[in-house]
Regions:
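Terminal alpha-helical segments
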Residues: 2-253
Length: 253
């Protein structure tokens, strides 16, 4: 009887295939993790860049408000203009003498938010109007930026009363936030609170000291200004608010 060779068939256990699948899945997870990390880093950088732009815009608004108070150009020369520039034709003007303070404050207090054309009486109640969206709880940012029936607004735009250039051009690049005036809620605004200073403090010794102490204040008129600047970023979630107190001291002849 002829011998029939016996053949042993070896069946693959599938370990190699399983190993390959595991490595493929790990590679996919690593690629997904890398893409998500890259996307997250891009979001962080983008948000930070937008915040920095808004911060620079708010600083520029503070400086513009100072020039508005002083009635000067950036080079120190006297501001000369027409219309709103230098407040030539604006009813609300920076007080130059003590007699100007009372009528100005009385006029401002008659308006919504006690502000008009960038000048305000001292705010009472809640101070952070930029965070308020409910008019029943106080003045809102929308009310402080929206144009009124007479065409005026409570706040002031960059360059509105100083003539500073805000439009972008090829030879004069500018912060895009300051140039954004598409709606009242975009771009940047500033408000100047006129705070009368107590005349008696000049002789009280509280601030004005002896020759070995601080230099005496030379305020004419006796007014301190509190400036609030709000800049909205290019992203709807970005907002920068800066405040500073400013005392305009007169140089003695």
């Amino acid at each position: 009887m002829p011998h029939v060779p016996y053949t042993v068939r070896r069946f693959q256990d599938g370990v190699a295939l399983f190993t390959v699948i595991v490595f493929i899945m790990l590679s996919m997870l690593l690629a997904l993790w890398a893409s998500r990390t890259s996307l997250f880093n891009e979001m962080v950088v983008s948000n930070d860049a937008d915040y920095q732009r808004a911060f620079e815009a708010a600083q520029a608004l503070l400086q513009d408000a100072e020039l508005d108070i002083r009635g000067e150009n950036p080079d120190g020369s006297m501001c000369v203009g027409a219309g709103n520039v230098c407040r030539t034709a604006t009813a609300e003007k920076i007080p130059l003498e003590a007699k100007d303070i009372g009528p100005l404050l009385s006029s401002l207090e008659a308006h919504l938010g006690q502000c008009r054309n960038g000048l305000c009486a001292k705010r009472t109640g809640s101070q952070d109007f930029w965070n308020n969206k409910d008019s029943t709880k106080g003045i809102t940012l929308g009310q402080m930026t929206t144009a009124r029936p007479d065409g005026t607004t409570a706040g002031a735009r960059y360059g509105q009363f100083t003539g500073a250039q805000w439009e972008s051009s090829s030879d004069k690049p500018i912060n895009p936030i300051l140039a954004d005036r598409s709606t009242s809620g975009r771009g940047g605004w500033y408000w100047i609170e006129v705070l009368p200073y107590d005349e008696s403090s000049k002789n009280s010794g509280v601030i004005v000291g002896t020759a070995n102490n601080l230099l005496p204040l030379n305020l004419t008129p006796s007014v301190i200004y509190r400036i609030t600047a709000v800049a909205q970023g290019l992203k709807s979630s970005t907002q920068v608010v800066l405040q500073q107190s400013y005392a305009q001291q007169k140089l003695k002849d």
